[in-house]
Swiss-Prot record:
Biological source species: Wigglesworthia glossinidia brevipalpis
GO cellular component, one term: ribosome
Protein name: Large ribosomal subunit protein uL23
PANTHER family, alphabetized: 50S RIBOSOMAL PROTEIN L23 (PTHR12059:SF8), RIBOSOMAL PROTEIN L23-RELATED (PTHR12059)
Classification via Pfam families: Ribosomal_L23 (PF00276)
Amino acid sequence: MINKKENIFKILTSSYSSEKSSILSEKNNTFTFKVLKNSKKSEIKSSIEKFFNVKVKKVRTVMLKGKSKKHKNIIGKRKNWKKAYVVLKKNQKINLIKNIE
């Protein structure tokens, strides 16, 4: 479990963008993040509320297996990772892409 004084950036590794996640963000106010494998839903919820200053309605997590990759005769494997779907309450928004002028 992450201590309160530790940085919230340790739980949220990055935002995740795909066709499915963009559709969910437009229709259901759901955002997708890559998180630490051992993080809990309550930790994810509190870190997003503190970092983005929004109210979270629900958090769903999925554990994804790393893909097997082959380069010439060497077979390798990517790391397993955890994805979190974060549903925000009504009238709450996260601006992941800031305008660059």
